[in-house]
Amino acid sequence: MNIFVFVKQIPVISDIRMNHQTFTVDRSSAGSMMNPADLHAVEAALSLKSVLGGSVTVLTMGDESCDVQLREAIAMGADTAVRITDDAYTGADTLVTAKVLTAAVRRLGPADCIFTGHASLDGATGQT
């Protein structure tokens, strides 16, 4: 069974500062962590793997700072971690992110099951 999990890096909430000129989160001011809902998705995928066998592949989109969360997923028991990165994706909206992750699964698949968190704490759109 090929199980995929999408994870997102988010800023540590207690460290967030706002840029008062652009009214955006200053991500450079905060550490990062795996989105908690995505962490639960990884745990659920690993539970399914323990029952049915197969492999768990964790995917994220971002720069090298995302590698910490991917290593965390590997330490939890994921078999493979994939970071998709390209300067063209910098600042990508949720639709672009969803399309890129979908294309990655199609290339790596076939996918028998895909897990995601229900929403991220930093955007809460629940669209990817």
Task: Indicate residue ranges for each PLM-predicted region.
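N-terminal glycine-rich FAD/FM-binding segment characteristic of electron-transfer flavoproteins
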Residues: 1-128
